[in-house]
């Protein structure tokens, strides 16, 4: 199927409104994420590899903020442990509806998937071996993040993992400037205009709040995780795995 091109911010907007995952975004999301997030495909692929290693028999794997289910599909295609299932959650009805269509096309549905439209803060996490927050925590208000991570830790089995991917910030101004500029250059190289980059940045300003890797790592320790590893970084995008 032909991938629809993201042109949401291609024309000047008369009034800037906060970014939201509505039907317009859902229609172009695969194109948007590939052209906007350096290394996205590698992150998705390796989420499946991590899940294959750490999924435990008879447990749940959670994809919190699943969008169209890319991480869910990656896990589904890799997990071989018996009696595992995946619980995929997103609060966008349009995302869940489209995600259900895409999952239905999977030719080897060996692992059951439950798609749930809900706020991830309201979902009960229990008997989990793998939990994924793939570019999701950054959209949760900062003051609510620790409580969510604590709930995830409490719902994980011993030996379970949390995979946390985020756009990140840097405390040193020079490093922050470098990574922001390189990200903008990455987007330009993928066909976005300066106006598109500027308008999307403004739309996300009050919605997505990045933090430093150190901030994430400290929160993971506060929540009870024994350790964490930064396993991927490209410019100001990173993914970590935390161990219970």
UniProtKB/Swiss-Prot annotation:
Enzyme Commission number(s) from the entry: 2.1.3.-
Superkingdom as given in the UniProt entry: Bacteria
GO MF terms, alphabetically ordered: carboxyl- or carbamoyltransferase activity; S-adenosyl-L-methionine binding
Pfam families the UniProt entry points to: Methyltransf_25
Enzyme category, top tier: transferase
Keyword S-adenosyl-L-methionine: yes
Sequence positions that bind S-adenosyl-L-methionine: 40, 65-67, 90-91, 134, 201
TM helices/strands, residue ranges: none
Reaction catalysed by this enzyme: prephenate + S-adenosyl-L-methionine = carboxy-S-adenosyl-L-methionine + 3-phenylpyruvate + H2O
Keywords assigned: S-adenosyl-L-methionine, Transferase
Metal-binding in keyword set: no
A biological process from GO: tRNA wobble uridine modification
InterPro entries membership: CmoA, Methyltransf_25, SAM-dependent_MTases_sf
Family per record: Belongs to the class I-like SAM-binding methyltransferase superfamily. Cx-SAM synthase family.
Function statement: Catalyzes the conversion of S-adenosyl-L-methionine (SAM) to carboxy-S-adenosyl-L-methionine (Cx-SAM).
Subunit structure: Homodimer.
Name of protein: Carboxy-S-adenosyl-L-methionine synthase
Source species taxonomy: Bacteria, Pseudomonadati, Thermodesulfobacteriota, Desulfuromonadia, Geobacterales
């Amino acid at each position: 199927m032909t991938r629809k091109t993201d042109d949401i911010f291609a024309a000047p907007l008369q009034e800037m409104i906060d970014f939201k995952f509505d039907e317009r975004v859902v229609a172009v999301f695969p194109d948007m994420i590939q052209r906007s997030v350096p290394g996205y495909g590698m992150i998705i692929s390796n989420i499946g590899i991590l899940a294959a290693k750490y999924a435990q028999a008879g447990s749940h794997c959670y994809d919190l903020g699943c969008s169209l289910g890319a991480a869910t599909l990656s896990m589904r295609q890799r997990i071989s442990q018996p009696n595992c299932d995946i619980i995929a959650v997103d609060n966008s009805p349009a995302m869940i509806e489209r995600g259900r269509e895409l999952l239905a096309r999977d030719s080897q549905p060996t692992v059951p998937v439950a798609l749930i439209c809900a706020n991830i803060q309201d979902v009960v996490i229990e008997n989990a071996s793998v939990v994924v927050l793939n570019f999701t925590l950054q959209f949760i208000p900062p003051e609510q993040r620790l409580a969510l991570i604590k709930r995830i830790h409490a719902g994980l089995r011993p030996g379970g993992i949390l995979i946390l991917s985020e756009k990140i910030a840097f405390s040193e101004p020079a490093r922050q400037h470098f990574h922001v500029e390189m990200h903008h250059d990455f987007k330009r190289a993928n066909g976005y205009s300066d106006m598109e980059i500027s308008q999307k940045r403004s739309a996300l300003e009050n919605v997505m709040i990045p933090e430093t890797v150190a901030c994430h790592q400290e929160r993971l320790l506060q929540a009870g995780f024994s350790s964490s590893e930064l396993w991927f970084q490209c410019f100001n995008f990173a993914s970590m795995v935390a161990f219970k």
